[in-house]
Amino acid sequence: MDGGFPQNRVGLVSEIGLMEDSFPPGFENEAKNLAIDFDGVIHNDDKGFHDGTCYGLPIPGSIEAIMSLSQTFRIIIFTAKAKPSRPLVDGKTGTQLVWEWLDRYGIASYVAEVTAEKPRALLYIDDHALSFSNWDETLQSPVLNSLRKGLNVT
């Protein structure tokens, strides 16, 4: 380290002896990672969580989008289905179920990782997100204010 900090975090990992798996998914490739939510973005989950299975069809355009995006980005799928605390479904973890679904629709080879953690990425594609620029705009967001009214919060 020559008395200072390494120029990058991967250097820091080797200098201080941390295990790379102690970092969030995608750490080593964050400069090209694109994180995409599974349910509601790729997988149609119109029945809600249901029993944890991946029962839905692909969201229209999602297959082609992942194939196209994977030419430029390293695709990471993030989903609560992959949480280790979730119960097994037919003896399979949520991560296994997601990989099987991706394989069934021919896109498993375009995806680098499936994780329950928020991965390090350049951009996140999620159906339950609000784009942030500053707090004044965020607090005035029609979407946020609509949710507040629905929850009777002023």
PLM regions and their residue ranges:
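HAD-like aspartate-dependent phosphatase fold
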Residues: 2-154
